[in-house]
Amino acid sequence: MKLDNIKRVGIILRPSTPELKDMFLEAKRIFESRGIEVSIDHISGGMIDVMGQPFDLLCRNSDFLVTIGGDGTLISAVRRSYEYQIPVLGIHAGKLGFLADLDFSELESFVDDLIAGEYRIDERAMLQATITTKHGESSVVAFNDIVLTRPSISKMIRLETYVDGRTFNTYYGDGVVISTPTGSTAYNLSAGGPVLFPLTHVFALTPICPHSLTQRPVVLPGHFEIEIKTPDASALVIVDGQDMVEITDNDTVHIKLADGGAHLIHRKEFNYFEVLKEKLGWGN
């Protein structure tokens, strides 16, 4: 994927952070001084007293999106813009992020690189979950992970798991994390799951505090599908730590890699392993 003849960009700011107004105005100046029209989504605009556009309209009218904030801001923008398959550039307003890896001080020079074609767009896998309950069916997408966990801390949860239609395992514990390669360094890593290179087409199934020490993480190929049932209790389905659905006994969740993905804009010299070393403190 390439950005040809860039004319319009849409900006999303981290919520509840009105102090980002100065960054927005500076970003607007940088883009507009190079002939690129700038718009902002209406929630971000309302936060800083600037006229904005509804998010769907912003996606339709922009060549790419820019998030200013942190990884959470970028994850939200990627999920909300999924149907448009629009590239996203993440700028961190604070500490370096795994995803929002461009420092704001680098923006002006990077915009020149964008115009010159000196950049890269990485396609990252996403998850799609179909949740079937007594009340109907709903579908969600996730960029990092989908977590099934117990609604109460007082007892374990039992999750029956099927892989490609065949019985695989019954997990007893606090739940499971189903993670994309991008999300493998989030909850998955804390739960003892593996680090997956973000451009691979696989996903991980990792138990959370399992009752049996033989329950270990599993990496599955991208064409597989997982089905999870809660046979005798309710559970929470948490999507990227941002949305939550409660399911009850015998409801099902089907999870697979989504047909589309996320398209992240990076500097041409972006190196995932350098970010990994920085964030995890490796090699220091």
Predicted regions and their residues:
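Catalytic core of DAGKc-family lipid kinases
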Residues: 96-174
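ATP/nucleoside-binding phosphotransfer catalytic cores, i.e., glycine-rich phosphate-binding loops
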Residues: 148, 164-167, 215-284
